[in-house]
Amino acid sequence: MNDDAPARFRWLPPGLRPPVEMVWRQERIFLLVGVAALFAGYDMNVYGLATPQIQAGLHIPENQIAPTLSIFRTAALAALLIASSADLIGRRRLLLLTIFGQAMFTLATAFSGDYLQFVGAQLLTRIFGYSEEMLCFVVIAEEMASSARGWANGTLGALDYLGAGFASLAFLAVNVLPLGWRALYMIGAVPLFLVAFLRRNLPETKRFAAQEKIEIARSKIAETTQLLRELIRQHPLRLLIMMIAAAGFGFGTAPAAFLSSDYLQSVIHYSPLQVNLVFIPGGLVGLALTVRAGRLSDRLGRKITTIGVVACGGIAFALFFSGISSWYLGPLWSLAFFGFLCGDALISGFALEIVPTRYRATVSGLRYVVNIGAGALSLLLEGRLYDHFHAHGRAVQLLLCSIPICLIAILFLPEPAGKKLEEMAA
């Protein structure tokens, strides 16, 4: 099909399709990026869902559950180096590497013989997985129409959300699968290898290709060292405010999102089936809300939509971990996880819309590292707070106090909705 042929997005329900006309090239790129987000959402949520089973199989103490995830999150530092190199060698080449690396080490996780091997395999999985996520949002920012970037960011987050839903469905059989939790990682690796094969047809983004022609004669080594200096010199305030917002969001939401499944099983005493009866319907609602919120941000603006979504998630998480055990848990989970995933998607896209093309992969990596690093610190503190309170709920509620910092920071960012990327970068 010709790249300039009209896009149809028939693989999406009518109400979730883009609000403006797009071409086949844009649909193809979005599909190849979005499918990877779908299966990455599955992969990254297995540990949180199957925590009790993995904990029992690898003999992990209760106060080390959250700190273990904080160890995983140090992978973001290596991921930053990989993602930043996309500003030098291109988005396409790196995306081919990251999806294959994530698939390979997801499969390796299933064969972990002990705790150290499990941590090592998951560290490598997340190095490539985090790099993948950083680059996906860069591609979306550079290829989608200005009036559809909010929709694209929201839909990408929704696909990640849908992947988490598939993980919940697979988790339903964790006690009957031949290899238990290990089978969940095997299941997740197969489609990632398939996406890696299909991604051979992913084209380079037009904006990077144009930038590359201008910069082709410059030393790549010199470019690497100067990139961050130029970024800090040209956009210091934007960069600082964006990183404060990312840190506040990551610090507040990381323990809440990760410990939800364990909390339901260990504190509320839900079975895997009951956990799925909360997660799956809530996930479907959250999926629709995430796409709607992305489209809403194109009309009302990124700032007001992001503030509303993040505030909704923070309040819902605080109530979810309050100790109530009733039908309220389902709606609260839906709103909380919607706020977490949609908020992350909107903030990710926000960061890339306010800087020039040559810095986008670097800024995406910086935001991701700050978000993941703040979350890692929060998860470490959660382990200490658990020792003090002897309960995850109160620890999580205390750590949610950073959400207002994120909201205040977003107020001071420029509004990118409906504007061309070149206009915002000026």
Question: PLM features: residue spans?
Answer:
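C-terminal transmembrane helical hairpin of 12-TM major facilitator-type secondary transporters
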Residues: S297, G301-F350
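Conserved MFS/SLC helix-loop-helix module at the cytosolic interface between two early adjacent transmembrane helices
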Residues: A78-Y115, S297-L300
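Central cavity-lining transmembrane alpha-helices of secondary-active solute carriers
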Residues: S70-S84, I280-R292
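Cytosolic juxtamembrane N-terminal segment immediately preceding the first transmembrane helix
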Residues: M1-Y42, Y47
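Glycine-rich segments within core transmembrane alpha-helices of 12-TM secondary carriers
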Residues: A148-V176, R367-L379
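Cytoplasmic helix-loop-helix junction between adjacent transmembrane helices
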Residues: G120-A158
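Helix-breaking motifs and short loop linkers at transmembrane-helix boundaries and internal kinks
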Residues: H59, G90, F111-Q117, A145, ...
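Extracytoplasmic gate region of multi-pass secondary transporters
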Residues: Y47-L49, H235-L287
